[in-house]
Amino acid sequence: MVSDSHPASGTSASDGSSLSDATRPSGRDGSDPGDYISNDDISNDDIRRPVAVIGAGAVGGSLARRLAVRQVPVRAVLSSRQAPARELATDVGAAVASDDVRDLPSDVRRVFLCVPDDALPGVAAELAKVDHPWSDTIVAHTSGARPASDLQALDRVGASLLSFHPVQSFATPNASAAFDGIYIGVEGHEVGIRYGSALARRLGATPFPLTAESKTRVHCAAALASNGFTALL
């Protein structure tokens, strides 16, 4: 079963400049993660490879709908809640709607986990048991606080990992337009960062580099900014 009751992200920020200042630590290999932000070597065909979205809540639904609007095909929607999965799959033209990760299409090479933070390791472990060409697959999650390494079960089977964090709040699964002009933090393996950066631009957002160490600081700062702004209203 897939757990996907993802709470709406509470990490909207009104000033992207403060985010970039918090993302300067070097990457896990000693390099600057910003080195991978350029998408010069990512072809349009690669960006448009079919995607599977796991989770049909506010974040998963909004992401899937935005992907479809930007002509990135969504091949499968996997969710523990079958009715929302079927509705989302119908809306985005996905051929597969299921509550079983074993139904992940074998030709999908881009997988997005839009599930609660505490469910990430378990869902990753379930996926890792699936007979799939993981060494040719990028697996991303959309958590603001958790690093890409939370998907370590998939790392062990050869997948490239990506944390793809939209710095935005999603109140409903239909908030496709909420991606307009936002920032998306990217962290993980080099292949994942390159893809995530190019995809963020495709969605109409601006990518910025994160490290596992800086993610929590950025998440907390954005949450405080969002909550502070709300308190002023």
Please provide the spans of the model-predicted regions:
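Internal alpha-helical scaffold of NAD(P)-dependent oxidoreductase catalytic cores
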Residues: 84-91, 176-218, 225-233
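Short, hydrophobic beta-strand segments that form beta-sheet elements in well-ordered domains
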Residues: 75-79, 139-142, 184-187
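Rossmann-like NAD(P)(H) cofactor-binding subdomain of soluble oxidoreductases
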Residues: 92, 98-175
